[in-house]
Amino acid sequence: MESTPKKAPRSKFPALLVVALALVALVFVIWRVDSAPSTNDAYASADTIDVVPEVSGRIVELAVTDNQAVKQGDLLFRIDPRPYEANLAKAEASLAALDKQIMLTQRSVDAQQFGADSVNATVEKARAAAKQATDTLRRTEPLLKEGFVSAEDVDRARTAQRAAEADLNAVLLQAQSAASAVSGVDALVAQRAAVEADIALTKLHLEMATVRAPFDGRVISLKTSVGQFASAMRPIFTLIDTRHWYVIANFRETDLKNIRSGTPATIRLMSDSGKTFEGKVDSIGYGVLPDDGGLVLGGLPKVSRSINWVRVAQRFPVKIMVDKPDPEMFRIGASAVANLEPQ
């Protein structure tokens, strides 16, 4: 009777290898999860501005519709320019009239200046005559005692000296009057500068009546139409700056140690989760509103915790700038998923 051969014992090496590989994979997954934070608590966002007119007036042209994309320099709306055109025409007419008045006044001033120069020459002549009369009197008076001149000669010298002084005072008054008349054109020149400033301001207001897009963007919250009276500094609609899109991703505070500015990120939007976008961390938030009713600071974002009956890690917003965003997919508030590369 033949005996059956015994089966060789199976090696345990393959099983141990599988277990080892599983442990390595588990360690890798744990490391990956710990060093490469990920969150689905994220949303797309972009900077916005309120489009406000800087002058008041009735809207006569509205060149955009709600949710329309615009390019930098595109016409948004136009305010009735007629009041500002009228103000400009009035100011320019005032300037023309003032220039004519200045021209006529300048002619008069030139004549007055000529008269003033003549009076100044007369003043010098009168001053010389008064000096001569005074010198003559000073020489004549001592001669009376010596008998070389008569008292009548001395009286005539005194009369001549007084007359010369009177003539000098008279021409000095004429010179002062002529000088004051010459300075009268300065006020008109100063008034012209004020009118020119008014013209410049009116031209600026007329330019502001036409409002154009300051950058590439998209119009939202448009709730007005042609004929509406627009008040200066009151918003007409909002304009999204579509040149730069970013994602606000709320990460647990325990993940922040692995996040820093410049960390590469992968972004997916809920509207099309099969498409990914690359980005980089721009900044990490340093303040959120607490849930326990503690100190509240205006302007801080509020990030709700997922469970409020268990002490869980707070979440802080991380701003991720998106490279080459799809303008048709990105919308403010769109749900997103953010995955950061391990650091």
Swiss-Prot record:
It comes from Escherichia coli (strain K12). It holds the Pfam family CusB_dom_1. The chain crosses the membrane at residues 13-33. One of its GO terms (molecular function) is xenobiotic transmembrane transporter activity. Residues 1-12 are cytoplasmic. It is a single-pass type II membrane protein. Its main location: membrane. Disulfide bonds: none annotated. Could be part of a tripartite efflux system composed of MdtN, MdtO and MdtP. Induction: Induced by LeuO, part of the mdtNO operon. It is found in: Cell inner membrane. GO terms for cellular component: membrane; plasma membrane; transporter complex. The keyword Acyltransferase does not apply. This is Multidrug resistance protein MdtN. The lineage of its organism: Bacteria, Pseudomonadati, Pseudomonadota, Gammaproteobacteria, Enterobacterales. Keywords: Antibiotic resistance, Cell inner membrane, Cell membrane, Membrane, Signal-anchor, Transmembrane, Transmembrane helix, Transport.
